[in-house]
Amino acid sequence: MNNVLIVSVIGPDRSGLVEQLAATIAAKNGNWLESSFSRLAGQFSGIVKVAVIGAGEEVLLALQQIAGLDIRGVLDVEREETALVSQSVALSLIGHDRVGIVKDVATILARFAVNIEKLETWLSSGAMSGEMMFHAQLILSAPLDVDLDQVHRQLECIADDLMVEWAD
């Protein structure tokens, strides 16, 4: 088993941040495994999974020295995958934007014990009306016995105009 350090990063965006993170991790013999980063409202934010030697304090302390970033870490032991008890499904949503839409979607998914593994949302101007349209792409982990048709019906009840599509 490998020790892994899960690091969250947030701070003002600037050129070269990923290079600084990668160089710091490599200098401390960490191995960059997985990551996801975004720029939102001028802020750089994301998460990276790093294989580390020992407890990983050296890697975390070195990362925390990068100016202008709030960096936090959690050490975990990477476990081998257990028997498949869930299915991975992709979901796409489009509808008129309104307050509480993400809460409503998350509530329905939680009701069916469906875990959100990845969530990307954005707004766009409607082609015909110019009204703001809400878009979401989700990767979900659902119990094998969950009725995805029932989940679909419940999601469609959130709003008359919400388009719900399971992706392949």
Listing of model-derived features with the role each one plays in the protein:
Residues 1-168:
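A conserved regulatory-domain signal marking ACT and ACT-like small-molecule sensing domains
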